[in-house]
């Protein structure tokens, strides 16, 4: 699925819609150059699920955990930024396997830096700069990822 995002608000909305339909245990890879909107999309995702604080790219910490507790659910979400990762094995030393537990949602920026160590993505999101906004492409790989793409097609 491909869509044009005219501005930051459209990127936030995509993140919000994604959050509303994303099942627990989903792994989402975010691809794009610096400034392409990856962290903006994550911000929309987290705010849609009730996070009220700032959302920053965990460039130096590699992962930022979020525990969102609602009236009916509790959800662990992990936002990774692997831009500064020098070796995928560093994720092992950070306890990375614990983050990819069955019920957590993992949003991974720069997943190519963790290639060979990271689990397969349910969904790949590619963001690309254009003069008048951004182009986004979503590719589902698992049943969960394919279902997400179909749901988003109907909403966006």
Task: Describe the residue ranges of each PLM region.
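The conserved Walker
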Residues: 34
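Conserved lysine of the Walker
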Residues: 38
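Short phosphate-coordinating micro-motif centered on Lys-Gly-acidic
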Residues: 1, 86-91, 97-156
């Amino acid at each position: 699925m491909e869509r044009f995002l005219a501005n930051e608000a459209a990127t936030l909305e995509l993140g919000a819609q994604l959050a509303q339909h994303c099942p627990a245990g989903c792994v989402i890879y975010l691809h794009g150059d610096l400034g392409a909107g990856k962290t903006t999309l994550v911000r929309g995702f987290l705010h849609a699920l009730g996070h009220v604080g700032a959302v920053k790219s965990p460039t130096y910490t590699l992962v930022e955990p979020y525990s969102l507790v609602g009236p009916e659910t509790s959800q662990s979400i992990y936002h990774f930024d692997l831009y500064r990762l020098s070796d995928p094995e560093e994720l092992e030393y950070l306890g990375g396997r614990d983050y990819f537990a069955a019920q957590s949602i993992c949003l991974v920026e720069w997943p190519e830096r963790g290639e060979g160590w990271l689990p397969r993505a349910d969904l790949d999101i590619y963001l690309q700069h254009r003069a008048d906004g951004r182009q986004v492409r979503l590719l589902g790989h698992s049943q969960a990822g394919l279902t997400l793409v179909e749901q988003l097609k109907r909403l966006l």
